[in-house]
Amino acid sequence: MKTVLTLIVAATLSLFSVAFAADTVVPQTTPTATAPAPAVHNASAKTMHHKKAQKPNTIKNTHKTAPEQKAQAAQKHHKAAHSHKAPTVAPAAK
């Protein structure tokens, strides 16, 4: 039983040492043999900045005429002025 356990431990340690050796050994290749990776994949997510798609100026700069603006503003102010009613006081009962 001890020999089986010893063989398993030895096999496990040898596999770990082989994997470690494979990670630490860098194969010597010429730099022209491999294509450089695109810069997009090398940059971290923090440095990436995506710009928003901009709308064309014709959509962005649609101006209302003055009477339409005044009418809309009057409606808003009318609603705001009448939405805050003063509390009504009930007469005290004697």
UniProtKB/Swiss-Prot annotation:
Bias (Low complexity): 30-40
Region annotation (Disordered) ranges: 30-94
Stated family: Belongs to the Asr family.
Keywords, comma-separated and alphabetical: Periplasm, Signal
Lineage: superkingdom: Bacteria
Signal peptide residue numbers: 1-21
Function as written in the Swiss-Prot or TrEMBL entry: Required for growth and/or survival at acidic conditions.
GO CC terms in record: periplasmic space
Naturally occurring in which organism (per UniProt): Yersinia pestis
Bias type Basic residues, positions: 75-85
Subcellular location: Periplasm
Name of the coding gene: asr1
Designated name of the protein: Acid shock protein 1
